[in-house]
Design a protein with these regions (language model features):
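Anionic-ligand binding region
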Residues: 192-222
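Non-cysteine beta-strand/loop elements that form the S-adenosyl-L-methionine
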Residues: 173-188, 258-267
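Conserved Radical SAM active-site core
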Residues: 45, 49-178, 187-188
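A cross-domain feature marking catalytic cores of carbohydrate-active enzymes
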Residues: 81, 132-134, 158-162, 183, ...
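Auxiliary Fe-S-binding modules of radical SAM enzymes
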Residues: 1-45, 216-341
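Hydrophobic faces of well-ordered beta-strands that scaffold small-molecule active sites
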Residues: 77, 128, 156-158, 179-181, ...
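Short glycine-enriched, charge-decorated loop/helix-capping segments at active-site entrances
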Residues: 95-105, 193-198, 275-282
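Conserved radical SAM core fold
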Residues: 97-98, 137, 162-165, 183-201, ...
Length: 341
């Protein structure tokens, strides 16, 4: 199979350029995410994400630690954006997501971001992975347009925390090939407590429904690598704090039982988690096994589950090495060992 990303056609008919221009206007009264800060980021005003109108790229690399159908044999061309529109106490990428004064030093132009995409394509990566793009979603579209103009022809992954604006996602329709959202919590209160965010579950459900409407529940493959579709990630938290059953119930009853889920066990008490008695320890095997049973209870069998020991192997070190922050990652397809039918 030879897959042609749909953003190529959007570029050819002029639609991609128009959407990039429309998206950038949103920054003048920012509604890039459900915070709806309505500040003018084009005039150096900062809202919750503490970001201006220029994208912050903290790191970019060929990454082998995604689901095997995304990393393949040549890696996902991941671009890690700095800052964030959440404040997770346990964030594993906190060195770049919650250190805004330092990350502002890594602002780049739209043209430079486009060139990074081209560089990752030249490295023979399978795709372009936009990691934590939400708060820069209004500016990234311009870079995609410029990159396609320079010859970008790879599928694009939107790897997000799920707290996205439906308005922005509609502008990304047929631009994004693979949606890779987190669905962190099945409860608004847990999200407020541990990610300092209002109405997370409500807003994430709306966003993921929009993603589902765009790409459906089927994964499209080119060889062994996915080139189009939706994969929902869910990180299991200690003491059931992610309200996982509500997450599975939503997916099964409001999306489809055929949706692919990446159920993650890689939680460890990073960032400020050691200060909270309920999350200051790794996940127990019994907790993870119970969560798998809940997933199966709702007829969700498509996707991947991690080995419980994954918390020992997935630990990024952005402060030590921005070029290769995952140098100690133990890349293996057994990290996500089971795919359903």
């Amino acid at each position: 199979m030879s897959f042609t990303p749909s953003h190529i056609k959007l570029y050819q008919n002029g639609e991609l350029k128009q959407r990039a221009e429309t998206a950038f206007q949103i920054l003048q009264s920012c509604k890039s995410c459900p915070h709806n800060c309505k500040i003018d980021r084009t005039n150096n005003e900062f809202g919750f994400c503490r970001s201006g109108n220029l994208p912050i790229v903290s790191s970019y690399t060929a990454h082998y630690g995604e689901e095997p159908v995304l990393s393949g044999t040549r890696g996902a061309g991941n671009i890690f954006f700095g800052n964030c529109n959440l404040r997770c106490m346990f964030c594993q990428n906190f060195e770049i997501s919650q250190n805004w004064k330092v990350e502002r030093e890594h602002e780049i132009s739209s043209e430079q971001l486009a060139q990074i995409m081209i560089e990752l394509q030249k490295r023979n990566c399978h795709n372009i992975g936009l990691v934590s793009p939400t708060h820069f979603s209004a500016t990234i579209l311009k870079s995609i347009y410029l990159a396609v103009e320079k010859g970008l022809s790879l599928p694009i992954i939107y790897n997000t925390n799920g707290y996205d604006s439906v308005e922005m996602l509609k502008l990304y329709n047929s631009v994004i090939d693979i949606y890779l959202p987190d669905l962190k919590y099945g409860d608004n209160q847990s999200a407020k407590t541990y990610s300092k965010i209002d109405y997370y579950f409500d807003e994430a459900k709306k966003a993921i429904k929009e993603m589902f409407n765009q790409v459906g529940d089927e994964l499209v493959y080119d060889g062994d690598v996915v080139v189009r579709g939706l994969i929902i990630r869910h990180l299991v938290l200690p003491n059931g704090l992610a309200e996982s059953e509500k997450v599975f119930k939503f997916i099964a009853e409001e999306l489809s039982r055929h949706v692919h889920i990446s159920l993650m066990s890689q939680y460890y008490p990073s960032n400020k988690a050691s200060n909270d008695i309920l999350i200051n320890r790794p996940l127990r095997e019994s907790e993870y096994e119970k969560t798998i049973e809940l997933m199966e209870k709702y007829g969700l069998y498509n996707g991947w589950i991690q080995e419980v020991e994954s918390s020992e192997s997935y630990r990024p070190y952005f402060s030590e090495d921005r070029v290769n922050p995952f140098k100690d990652y133990k890349s293996s397809s057994s990290s996500f060992p089971k795919e359903g039918t």
